[in-house]
């Protein structure tokens, strides 16, 4: 049971003040493969470019908005999926992906405009944040 679940059971919840900062020096803690994926995503975010990758046997094109870490310590990306379909049949929309499960992550070299998306930066769906647009 996570800390948040335990607090909920006990009736105690901390007031959410937003995500904590993760430090880029910590990227290597995820291992060589995941660190390389994180760096590719961060590079694309520097220029507001889409990324493409394979996830659950499906190709996805995503506008990355947040790269961070879950409360369980998993590297995550939150982004808007503009192309591709999930196993559940969902098409375009906001998604959270575990970076270690992403395959063949590359920069799509196509730009996107952050203002075209309804992004709530107060609640990025990560515990710690490496980068957020």
Where are these regions (language model features)?
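Short glycine- and basic-residue-enriched patches
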Residues: 1-133
């Amino acid at each position: 049971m996570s800390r948040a679940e335990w607090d909920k059971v006990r009736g105690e919840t901390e007031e959410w003040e937003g995500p904590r900062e993760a430090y880029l020096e910590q990227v290597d803690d995820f291992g060589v493969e995941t660190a390389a994926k994180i760096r590719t995503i961060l590079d694309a975010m520097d220029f507001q470019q889409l990324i493409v990758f394979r996830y659950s046997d499906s190709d996805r094109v995503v506008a990355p908005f947040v790269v961070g870490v879950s409360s369980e310590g998993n590297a995550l990306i939150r982004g808007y999926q503009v192309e591709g379909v999930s196993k559940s049949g969902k098409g375009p929309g906001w998604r959270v992906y575990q970076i270690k499960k992403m395959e063949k992550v590359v920069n799509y070299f196509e730009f996107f405009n952050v203002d075209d998306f309804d992004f709530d930066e107060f609640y990025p769906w990560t515990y710690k944040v490496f980068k957020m647009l």
